[in-house]
């Protein structure tokens, strides 16, 4: 097999910095952009009019105040951020430096100015929400179905194709294959231990006392013993090996200090006609009260289990998700259920509490019916979905379950091979490794949901871009061919179909149709006249 060498840029000759000037630096901005660049392909792939209308319908347009940002800039910036796995500030810097990204956002000319302040990303995630991003994902994912429909229309039918078997009318109406699976999306928080969480709650309660104390209303400021409390905490936390007795003793001391601080906060609040705290601080107060009750109950019963356990003072919506994996038996974040249909991912459910995906399987099947107007022909799922009730419900709807059958193992293995579920496992690996699904850095509940939905959207865009790239290459080549055909009076033998996006056979057809005409083949793939 002949080795393919990648063409690299020429290595520049070293020049002293004293001889380099910014004005003399040559730029390629006067040349045409590369048509095969990923941002150019995505810019032509996304239906911006429909997507922007969905955004404006959800956000709304006000006649007063500052004019809103361009919806394409808002949505495109989120796509760039998650596709490149950048933080908010780095995303703004990359956009101001990259001409292809600016073309993707709809800019007509290059500008070195930042499109907006990086802090607006938080507002974008708040405004969009998971539902709007899922609607945009559905709209973009429909492009795959549209491509396949046009491909079937352009593909000629032959008499050798077998006729459809209508022996089972219910099963014949079902179309497609669907793969189910669930995973956890860990939040960017420290691993929670009771002692560390108690220390965080104690320090936050001390801050609330400082904010509530007023010399005009209170004679003496309540004592918090923060130095002693910090010393007691570090005395145990910094030990390499801690016994149960030492941990219980340190936990009890922190609980008593938090109880004292909460009593002081209540006495300070009694002197005010209304609660003077800001909404954010008042939320911290409610979280600390709930957290103290949970920890005190576990301390008294000497257990480590409780319902709706708080694992982060700053993100109280996060819950522990028991996964049973070898690397992490418990993950802290949201649990999502994803279905894959022909390489396209759909976010079926997102919950901050653990749930059994097998008990919700028929709800996911009904969502497939809402999207495509029919039930799937085949369903591929893990063992947790294959209960007797689910098997009976799928059989009633004519859906074939590709899983190990119940009962005594047969002599011939007929169940599905483990590699059949590789596509969805690969999607999870791609999302967690390349796009940051294994570390959600958003702090709020709604912004975290938008973060996860944006990553699912990026997965589909990457998939569709890989399908559509050969189509854009062929279209660009044929445009060059058409421009030179008029000059050289060359009439093409046949019109190439561009609707078959992603079919590698198109490139072969172009070579085969022109192989007997060297002049024509040269004009089809070269922009230089002979």
Question: Regions from the language model: what does each represent?
Answer:
Residues 1-47, 409, 469-530:
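Charged, often Cys/His-bearing segments associated with DNA-binding zinc-finger transcription factors
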Residues 33-79, 83:
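Basic, short loop/linker segments at the boundary and entry of helix-turn-helix/winged-helix-like folds
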Residues 80, 213, 360-378:
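Short, basic/hydrophobic alpha-helical segments
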Residues 325-371:
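Electropositive, glycine- and tryptophan-enriched low-complexity nucleic-acid-binding patches
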Residues 108, 112-315:
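Active-site- or DNA-interface-adjacent structural scaffold in DNA-acting proteins
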Residues 284-286, 292-299, 416-500, 504-510:
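Basic, amphipathic alpha-helical segments enriched in Lys/Arg and hydrophobic/aromatic residues
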Residues 37, 75-77, 91-95, 117-121, ...:
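Short, conserved catalytic/metal-binding motifs centered on acidic residues
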Residues 65-69, 82, 99, 380-389, ...:
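Acidic, metal-coordinating catalytic cores used for nucleic-acid/nucleotide bond scission
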